[in-house]
């Protein structure tokens, strides 16, 4: 940095964008192979290369920002804009999933029995595990904010405690979601309901796992004194990402679990009973 005449970071050539793209291709292709041919070899190869890429890319960024001093205020401003655009792109992913769900549920076709949920589908009760998951993520949003304020106030002990609580809640959410998938009476291949349900909630679950990994890295960095009260964008980005995951879950809960499953099935049952009583009269 002593020989630079500008505040920007001229990044050295890095192989990680290429290896990340190739591992994403392997992971996606492996997922297709697993779904259609019950072969998980390619998927685990993609997952392994993805994890290795994440580790080494994260290592390089930490070295550049913490030990080499390349993350100047100007660079941090660019990183903030980049993180905002990344989260915005993720928002559009979920808009697509919600669009597919509402397109199918607001005007169900005759093939679905003209009702939503489709005939033969027994939706999950939103007042059981989904409601517990909602409270868990809301609590984790409070604890991550506590961690952020503790970091800005220089309270290292409370920051570590709050971060541990957030990570624990995130892992607990993932375990409950996996149990819910295992016990569900329908699968991803059960028509448009199963597809939209598992793709939307599964993609969100993947984001929870990624966010938990992000927070674990932040916890390790805090233990090694990488963050200060004025220089902690790595943690700030993780907190933004976690709040995004929280907000998306609220929309998922209200749309898919409550309105699209439980509430719609109650309306369909009431309509059916009223029609039956009318025909009997």
From Swiss-Prot:
Topology of the protein relative to the lipid bilayer: Multi-pass membrane protein
The EC number(s) this enzyme carries: 7.1.1.9
Catalysed reaction equations from the record: 4 Fe(II)-[cytochrome c] + O2 + 8 H(+)(in) = 4 Fe(III)-[cytochrome c] + 2 H2O + 4 H(+)(out)
Key words, A-Z: Membrane, Mitochondrion, Mitochondrion inner membrane, Translocase, Transmembrane, Transmembrane helix
Mitochondrial matrix side: 1-15, 67-72, 153-155, 224-232
GO terms, molecular function: cytochrome-c oxidase activity
A Gene Ontology term for the protein's cellular component: respiratory chain complex IV
Principal place of residence: mitochondrion
Residue ranges crossing the lipid bilayer per the database entry: 16-34, 41-66, 73-105, 129-152, 156-183, 191-223, 233-256
Tagged with keyword Isomerase: no
Compartmental location: Mitochondrion inner membrane
Mitochondrial intermembrane side: 35-40, 106-128, 184-190, 257-281
One annotated GO biological process: mitochondrial electron transport, cytochrome c to oxygen
Protein function: Component of the cytochrome c oxidase, the last enzyme in the mitochondrial electron transport chain which drives oxidative phosphorylation. The respiratory chain contains 3 multisubunit complexes succinate dehydrogenase (complex II, CII), ubiquinol-cytochrome c oxidoreductase (cytochrome b-c1 complex, complex III, CIII) and cytochrome c oxidase (complex IV, CIV), that cooperate to transfer electrons derived from NADH and succinate to molecular oxygen, creating an electrochemical gradient over the inner membrane that drives transmembrane transport and the ATP synthase.
Quaternary context: Component of the cytochrome c oxidase (complex IV, CIV), a multisubunit enzyme composed of 14 subunits. The complex is composed of a catalytic core of 3 subunits MT-CO1, MT-CO2 and MT-CO3, encoded in the mitochondrial DNA, and 11 supernumerary subunits COX4I, COX5A, COX5B, COX6A, COX6B, COX6C, COX7A, COX7B, COX7C, COX8 and NDUFA4, which are encoded in the nuclear genome.
Homology family: Belongs to the cytochrome c oxidase subunit 3 family.
Protein name per its UniProtKB record: Cytochrome c oxidase subunit 3
Source organism (scientific name): Didelphis virginiana (North American opossum)
Gene behind the chain: MT-CO3
């Amino acid at each position: 940095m002593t020989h630079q005449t500008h505040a920007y970071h001229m990044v050295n050539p890095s192989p990680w964008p290429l290896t990340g793209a190739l591992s994403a291709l392997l992971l996606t292709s492996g997922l297709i192979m697993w779904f259609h041919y019950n072969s998980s070899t390619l998927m685990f190869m993609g997952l392994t290369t993805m994890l290795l890429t994440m580790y080494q890319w994260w290592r390089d960024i930490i070295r550049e920002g913490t030990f080499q001093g390349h993350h100047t205020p100007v660079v941090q401003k660019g990183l903030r804009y980049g993180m905002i655009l990344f989260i915005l792109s993720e928002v559009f992913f979920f808009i697509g999933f919600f669009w597919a769900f509402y397109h199918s549920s607001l005007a169900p076709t005759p093939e679905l029995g003209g009702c939503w949920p489709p005939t033969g589908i027994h939706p999950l009760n939103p007042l059981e595990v989904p409601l517990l998951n909602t409270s868990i993520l809301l609590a984790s949003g409070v604890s991550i904010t506590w961690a952020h304020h503790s970091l800005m106030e220089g309270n290292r002990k409370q920051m570590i405690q709050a971060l541990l609580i957030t990570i624990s809640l995130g892992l607990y959410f993932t375990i409950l979601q996996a149990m819910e998938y295992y016990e569900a009476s329908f699968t991803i291949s059960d028509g448009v309901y199963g597809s939209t349900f598992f793709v939307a909630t599964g993609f969100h679950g993947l984001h929870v796992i990624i966010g938990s990994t992000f927070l674990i890295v932040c916890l390790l960095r805090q233990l090694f004194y990488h963050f200060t009260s004025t220089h902690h964008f790595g943690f700030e980005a993780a907190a933004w990402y976690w709040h995004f995951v929280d907000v998306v879950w609220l929309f998922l809960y209200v749309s898919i679990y409550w309105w699209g499953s439980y509430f719609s099935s109650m309306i369909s049952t009431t309509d059916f009973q009223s029609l039956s009583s009318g025909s009997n009269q």
